[in-house]
């Protein structure tokens, strides 16, 4: 043992391995007793995710560090009890529900643009995380995504590229992008349509060609004595359906080899260009009125319809002494018949020659024939 007058030599052992017998330990006169509890750990509560830096309050922190006191150990082949504090790095799994609550309060709740393949004719659409996160909250074991936002984003993007909605099962869905036009602006909206519900184009064409044209009976042609095949004119319900049929436009003399494949149409066209120009009227009706929800194929038709809600009446009768105004042009044309006396709609029943300026008045009149017949 060295004397008290000898100088004390300090050896630095940091980052070096020195045999225990090389280091000479100095005994201590007094040892302070410290009560220790084994396996006691104090941790700092933070929010974050496993395997990444901790995020709390908008700042990033290093991985969680716990200070853990251990019982005395014999490091130098001696029996001296000493208090020793070591720094131990460990991982703590924070429940993903807390992470969800944090994300819902941040900009992750806003909408995210999903990339879409242009070859699939899909426009960029939007999806929000809030709906998925609310469904997963509190269902860690049952959640199909396991609280992993990256995995959920991958599923959504893959579904958008393939035209399949990941939240609608195994069915094949086709995405359609529509535009809701309101009085204050336009609002994009994405819709999904089940491909299994699409009709066979051949069957649609055959059904369209078999539909007869009854519009001629509304403009002067009389019902035949034997009646109309397939329609009981004495049945008020069938007669009402007859009056609701839309008239067909007259066809020209040139050949029309190309048929429209939409169900219930069956129109023929001279070439593919004319058919494609016509095909857009079958939808989808992407221009939707924000006031009443009525949809239109063309934006011009929607703007004309919105005049009903705004109260604007740009169409005015030009007859002297009248000056009435209308929101729609065809209402003005119908009104003008009052001044001209034109009544193009004639009752089709035999021995009845009543004429009307509006088709709605004729349809109401036709139903009176059945009512009078049932009263007799």
Curated annotation (Swiss-Prot):
Region entry Disordered: which residue ranges? Answer: 201-220
Main location, first listed in the record: nucleus
Annotated keywords: Activator, DNA-binding, Metal-binding, Nucleus, Repeat, Repressor, Transcription, Transcription regulation, Zinc, Zinc-finger
List the SMART domains. ZnF_C2H2 (SM00355)
Entry keyword Transcription regulation: yes
What ranges of residues constitute the C2H2-type zinc fingers? 258-282, 287-309, 315-339, 345-369
Its Gene Ontology biological processes?
A: positive regulation of transcription by RNA polymerase II; regulation of transcription by RNA polymerase II
Q: Which Pfam families match?
A: zf-C2H2
- Ranges for the region named Mediates transcriptional activation are 36-109
Q: Region (Mediates transcriptional repression): which ranges?
A: 241-376
Q: Name its cellular compartments.
A: Nucleus
In Gene Ontology terms, what is one molecular function of this protein? RNA polymerase II cis-regulatory region sequence-specific DNA binding
Output the Gene Ontology cellular-component terms. chromatin; nucleus; PcG protein complex; transcription regulator complex
An additional note in the Swiss-Prot or TrEMBL entry is:
The gene encoding this protein appears to have arisen by retrotransposition of the YY1 gene in placental mammals. It is encoded by a single exon found in an intron of the gene Mbtps2.
What does the function comment of this entry state?
Functions as a multifunctional transcription factor that may exhibit positive and negative control on a large number of genes. May antagonize YY1 and function in development and differentiation.
> Which family is annotated?
Belongs to the YY transcription factor family.
- Protein name per UniProt: Transcription factor YY2
The lineage, from the top, is: Eukaryota, Metazoa, Chordata, Craniata, Vertebrata
